[in-house]
């Protein structure tokens, strides 16, 4: 995201999805490589990620934690600081309600960034919401 003349703009957004048919090390390596390419292309001042959360599904939580590790390592390798926000803090920052649904977050992200359509998939709107949370916490400096 970029701020110019008090206008907030999303230059690009999307998702990085490692191939499901590969071994764990290859999927994490793919994620690391793709994030590294994006960091090199866009040269952000900061990377913000969602903090870990408690889940009843241990396997899902473990997979997300491993993916976060690859992303944080890519940030470190690119010498870019990384900050983490809890899911509740992100939702509260963007929607005003820490228990908001993913669809509510998606709707608010579209409105705040004045996008033509809802950002999809929901993971994209979540990522944009994390960026907005960072900007809100830092008073859009």
Language model: regions and residue ranges:
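Phosphate- and other anionic-substrate recognition elements at nucleic-acid/protein interfaces
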Residues: 4-141
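Sequence context surrounding c-type heme c attachment/ligation sites in exported
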Residues: 1
């Amino acid at each position: 995201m970029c701020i110019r003349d008090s206008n907030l703009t999303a230059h690009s957004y999307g998702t990085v999805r490692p191939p499901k048919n590969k071994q764990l090390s290859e999927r994490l390596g793919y994620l690391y490589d793709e994030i590294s390419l994006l960091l090199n292309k866009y040269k952000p001042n900061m990377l913000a990620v969602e903090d870990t959360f408690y889940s009843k599904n241990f396997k899902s939580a473990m997979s997300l934690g491993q993916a976060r590790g690859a992303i944080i390592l890519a940030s470190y390798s690119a010498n870019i600081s990384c900050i983490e926000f809890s899911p509740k803090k992100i939702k509260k920052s963007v929607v005003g309600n820490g228990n908001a649904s993913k669809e509510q977050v998606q709707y608010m992200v579209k409105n705040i960034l004045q996008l033509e359509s809802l950002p999809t998939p929901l993971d994209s709107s979540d990522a944009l919401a994390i960026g907005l949370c960072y900007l809100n916490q830092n008073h859009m400096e």
